[in-house]
UniProtKB/Swiss-Prot annotation:
Binding-site residues, Zn(2+) 2: C89, H215, H219, H225
Co-factor(s): Ca(2+); Zn(2+)
Protein name: Interstitial collagenase B
Glycosylation positions in this chain: N370
Cofactor note: Binds 4 Ca(2+) ions per subunit. Binds 2 Zn(2+) ions per subunit.
Binding site for Ca(2+) 2: D155, G187, G189
Alphabetic keyword roster: Autocatalytic cleavage, Calcium, Collagen degradation, Disulfide bond, Extracellular matrix, Glycoprotein, Hydrolase, Metal-binding, Metalloprotease, Protease, Repeat, Secreted, Signal, Zinc, Zymogen
GO molecular function: metalloendopeptidase activity; peptidase activity; zinc ion binding
Gene name linked to the record: Mmp1b
Length: 463
């Protein structure tokens, strides 16, 4: 059976009130009729003016009211009309379309995805991050794993289109139809299409790309709509700028298809309390404007537009990395991360360890044989020079020439006055290096070459 397209639409109701059907008033009955035709399988050949048509319409209204948790009257009463006016997903809510035939699901647990193109309203990094977070919504609670691929089409292809784009479901630039997806299967199966003309955002305005993608991927994995208004898969589109948590109803339904995660996340672990004043970290990095703190098997993300940090599991994002890193840093300008443990280095792009890694730090960077681990590392944005801190010394590496600068190692305290202790971690933000020692951070101004502030690490978490 071919995949049924799952259209995500907004149905804008008229600004004036709809008449009650039983009153026989016809002024706006076509709008109600169209809504029920789109989402409740109301027969296109039915006529609202016929007695049978009125009865069928009333029955469809009762179905809609029951799903939305409204008073079941069969009338287009004000509460029902308000629900109809809300932005919503265009996937039909009743059989035969919403109850997918034989519960289509993927027959494998490792799925790939590819991003074909981008919206002009967000940077590539923000788009990629939103999509990756949307996939993690589902991988966190199932055995499913998702990996982005670049050289070929993934099992799930995400793309932005304008107008007629070849799947019979034309975008028109209006807010009534801004994305659609397809059920699991071959060909278009699982794919997600976005309207290129819409304003996609990472906040509460217009359409939040993360939230829409997470909802659409629920359909791509085989889910229909939920009658739990707090669920991600509830028909109405709502988003608030807060730390997203998947509803238990969504978890139960996706696990009915694929089973639970073999490594369930325990977010109550004491190590995950960001406001613990004594909390220390294995490694700290900047990445695409975020600050990421690694601790045991978890990491904490600080994102400027979110009021609270996000907590995730390292293995779910980077499954091929070792746990408990010694150090890590972002290579400026190339969208690459490097992680260190012992005398090994792993180079990573997206979720993938690059070919040939891990490598010995001696052969890759040119460290002497007596350097067997790295305490901290940071790549200076303006110069492309990476600073490696080991005990009381530091080395400087040129990322452009891929060689150590002559004259190193040097004493940390000599070139960074006031930093006279072991450096646990270091990052750069604007014109400052932030040096971390135990649970304290020191802000070192690169222009004045002085420490100008110190504070607890948990100030990053709005504690």
């Amino acid at each position: 059976m071919p995949s049924l397209p799952l259209l995500l639409r907004l149905w804008a109701a008229s600004s004036y009130s709809f008449p009650v059907i039983q009153d026989g008033l016809q002024k706006n009955v076509k709008t109600v009729w169209k809504y029920l035709e789109n989402y409740y399988n109301l027969g296109k050949n039915m006529q609202a003016k016929n007695v049978n048509g009125k009865e069928v319409m009333a029955e469809k209204l009762r179905q809609m009211q029951q799903l939305f948790g409204l008073k079941v009257t069969g009338n287009s009463d004000p509460e029902t009309l308000r629900a109809m006016k809300k932005p919503r997903c265009g996937v039909p809510d009743v059989a035969p379309y919403a109850i997918t035939h034989n519960n289509p699901r993927w027959t494998k647990t490792h799925l790939t995805y590819s991003i074909l193109n981008y919206t002009p309203y967000l940077s590539k990094a923000v788009v990629e991050d939103a999509i990756a977070r949307a996939f993690r919504v589902w991988s966190d609670v199932t055995p499913l794993t998702f990996q982005r691929v670049f050289e070929e089409e993934g099992d799930i292809v995400l793309s932005f289109h304008r107008g007629d784009h070849g799947d019979l479901y034309t975008f028109d630039g209006s807010k009534y139809h801004f994305a659609h997806a397809f059920l699991p299967g071959l060909g278009l199966g699982g794919n997600v299409h976005y309207d290129l003309d819409q304003k996609w955002t990472d906040n509460n305005e217009d359409f939040n790309l993360f939230y829409v993608t997470a909802h659409e991927l629920g359909h791509s994995l085989g889910l229909s709509h939920s009658n739990d208004e707090e669920a991600l898969m509830f028909p109405s589109y709502t988003w608030s700028n807060k730390d997203f948590v998947l509803n238990q109803d969504d978890i139960n339904r996706i696990q009915a298809l694929y089973g639970p995660s073999p490594n369930p996340i325990q977010l109550t672990d004491a190590t995950l309390d960001p406001c613990n004043s004594g909390l220390t970290f294995d490694a700290i990095i900047t990445y695409r404007g975020e600050v990421i703190f690694f601790k045991d098997r978890f990491y904490i993300r600080v994102i400027s537009f979110l009021p609270e940090p996000l907590i995730d599991v390292i293995d779910l994002t980077w499954p091929n990395l070792p746990g408990k890193f010694d150090a890590a840093y972002e290579v400026s300008g190339v969208d690459e991360l490097r992680f260190f443990k012992g005398s090994k280095v792993w180079a990573v792009q997206e979720q993938n360890v690059l070919e040939g890694f891990p490598m010995d730090i001696q052969s890759f960077f040119g460290f002497p044989s007596n350097v067997t681990n790295i305490d901290a590392a940071v790549c200076e944005e303006e110069t492309g020079k990476t600073y490696f801190f080991v005990d009381h010394m530091y080395w400087r590496y040129d990322e452009n020439t891929r060689s150590m600068d002559p004259g190193y190692p040097r004493l940390i305290a000599e070139d960074f006055p006031g930093i006279d202790y072991k450096v646990d971690d270091v990052i750069q933000k604007e014109d400052n290096f932030y040096f971390f020692h135990q649970s304290i951070q020191y802000r070192f101004n690169l222009k004045t070459r002085r420490i100008d502030d110190s504070s607890d690490i948990n100030t990053w978490f709005n504690c």
